[in-house]
Amino acid sequence: EIIKCDWSSDVCSSDLRWISAQLSSITGPIYAVGTGGNIAKLYNISGQVDETKTMEISELRKVSAYVKSFTYEERVNKLRLNTDRADVIVPAASIYLAAMECAQCPSIFVPDLGLKDGIIQLLYDRYLQRKKSSN
């Protein structure tokens, strides 16, 4: 699938330009990693059961359009989203899609751990290493 950057998206064009500018220094494939509640919820709504926890950009487009087709109230009542999530999930999907399109990234990895959890795990692992080496 050919992925093109949509400069007319709702995402700030300066952010998209920054992403595009970074591409010249990257060789090889580009991978997207999404953390947090919005991408996790989009992944769950997609109904995918995938051991790799990845979602193709085409699937993200579909689930984004699906969620966007509901009103705020329907997102809360029919999709069972929390009120704070129902309010921001559509713009969040637009941001993920715009960033992936500009980076020409075909899929996004949706880990079970959030960014905060991953940083805490990393710090704890480093602490254990220091403690181990000091004994």
What are these regions (language model features)?
Residues N44-K68:
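Gly/Ser/Thr-rich active-site loops/lids in small-molecule metabolic enzymes
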Residues E1-V11:
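Single conserved hydrophobic/aromatic residue that forms the stacking wall/gate
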Residues W18-Y31:
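Phosphate/pyrophosphate-binding loops at sites that engage ATP/ADP/AMP, CoA/4′-phosphopantetheine
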Residues P29-N38, P106-P111:
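Short glycine-rich phosphate-binding loop at a beta-alpha junction
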Residues C12-W18:
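Conserved ATP-binding module of the ATP-grasp superfamily
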Residues I39-Y43, K116-D117:
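Short, active-site-adjacent cap segments at secondary-structure transitions
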